[in-house]
Amino acid sequence: PRLSSAASDVYKRQELLNPNSTIKPKEVIKIQLNGLQKNDSKFKDSGIEQTWNFAHPNNKRVTGPLSKFKMMLKSDSYGMMINHLSHTITELGSSDKWAQFEVIILDKNKIYHKFNWQVEKYTLDGSLKDCWLTTMVSSPIPLGSSI
């Protein structure tokens, strides 16, 4: 028997990656960007949910709940991240507690956008202890067309 779409989504949600202490700062951003690049690959908005999984709790307090986070990522401010064509991630600086990256996204309209992306190591006890999580993504800086 086929699973209902709701049951299927629950099953597919288990395929999303969750933070663990072995995932390095740049890999966190890569996981988030790869999800957003193929936003509906596992189920509708699976990429946004993948990104949400690696958001720092302090970030989630400001941008959440998930339904609000989805609307924010689909807004004019961040919509170019959804189903973008390609991205590059360049480390700008880091310590043992934080790392800052420049992310350049080529959107589906072939326009480049630059973001500053920051991750921090979660230090409190619990399942997220020592995991790298996204604390801040800047507003996009348009860099113009690729043509």
Which sequence ranges carry the predicted segments?
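Single conserved hydrophobic/aromatic residue that forms the stacking wall/gate
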Residues: 1-11
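N-terminal secretory signal sequences
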Residues: 12-13, 60
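TPR-adjacent "capping" and linker segments in tetratricopeptide-repeat scaffold/adaptor proteins
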Residues: 16-21
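Short, aromatic-enriched amphipathic alpha-helices that serve as compact interaction elements
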Residues: 24-40, 54
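Short solvent-exposed beta->alpha transition segments
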Residues: 43-96
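Exposed beta-sheet edge and beta->alpha loop/turn motif
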Residues: 91-147
